[in-house]
Amino acid sequence: MMTEAYFEPLGTDDGWEVFRATPHTVSAWGPDLQHGAPPSALLTRAMDRLDPSDETRIARVAVDLLGPVPLGELRTRARVTRPGRRIQLVESELEARGRMVARASAWRMLVSDTAEVEQTLDQPRRLPGADHNSEFFNRWTSGYIDSLEIRGAEDGTVWARPTLPLVAGEETTPAEHVMCVADIANGVGAVLEPHEWRFLNTDVITHLHRRPVGQWIGVTARASIGPDGVGATTGTLFDEVGAIGHTLQALLIERV
């Protein structure tokens, strides 16, 4: 029976946490590859749960996808590379079949009360009703995409809610939850037809100016395509209260 989560925990091994990726992580680009979102969230998990404190939170996550992330057994570990009471830099790595397939870094910052000066450039977006299914994702199918409940708003925002936990038996943290969704910006912002072009992202960099609340994450995004096979997707992330941050992805553009 398939585990109803993106990853199944298998224990620890010499400082590494070991997991098995389930078919719910499968990418639309190939049946043996993971979508970028689940491994990005798993790397975030390793950093988020390393010496956690209520006095700090993740402000930025930068994930580098070093190659195709396969299904099967994976290992993660994390370390603090810049300790500090107010600002910390944390790094994590993801290994599969004896090679590093992805790595990440995160800035953790001291939290304090700045509610009186809170502001953002982006206006809140309204979560549409259950009858608003996103037609865009009808072009895509995969284990990962099928694990999302998706709604499309008239203003172009795509709202997504993962229906599975990141790791079986665990409650997904807010930072992990955002990273379970942020990588879909590449698809949301696509300006090329996927049956004619591949637009693979090699990274996902996410800044969070506010801790997300609730289960739904809204994404607005747009790709820019250069003349030489390179592009970039820029996106804004929302919860039902308003904007929570921004995301950026580098793209490799190739004809199918």
Where are these regions (language model features)?
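Terminal targeting signals and extreme-terminal segments of soluble enzymes
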Residues: 1-256
